[in-house]
Amino acid sequence: MAKLSGSIDVPLPPEVAWKHASDLSRYKDWLTIHRVWRSTLPDDIEKGTVVESIVEVKGMYNRIKWTVVRYKPPEGMTLNGDGVGGVKVKLMAKVRPADEGSTVGFDVHLGGPALFGPIGMIVAAALRSDIKQSLQNFVRVFTAPDPGTNGDGGVRH
């Protein structure tokens, strides 16, 4: 199983960073592997919530059925994913207080028969850069002073 991690400092209070990191409807704006939701998104997320999406890594698409197995606002959530071909994915999102706001982190675990051998190494390498780009996108999307993309950008009026 490939295990990948990444984190980035975000100039937002933890509660605001959490709001954005846990907003499934906004994944298309910053999470590079997310293509489209294939199920209706719930109004509220809780342990046991199930959603389906299409993800893409290195030009390879897979339909993933995600189950929320841990949901602890504003600290983190874990989604276990089962994909076509026995692909297994675990996505762990974490938000921690930091000196200048928050640290947002993602851990991704990949497994299953389709990801053994050379193809697994290629996917893991591609996913490593996707995690880094996604975290940079997160900062750009949710901290830029553009009310059209991020509301107040975490600024308190």
Q: Which stretches of residues belong to each language-model region?
A:
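Beta-strand/loop substructures that line and gate deep hydrophobic ligand-binding cavities in soluble
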Residues: N80-Q133, T149-G151
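Glycine-rich portal/gate segments that line the openings of hydrophobic small-molecule binding cavities
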Residues: R38-G85, T103, Q133-H157
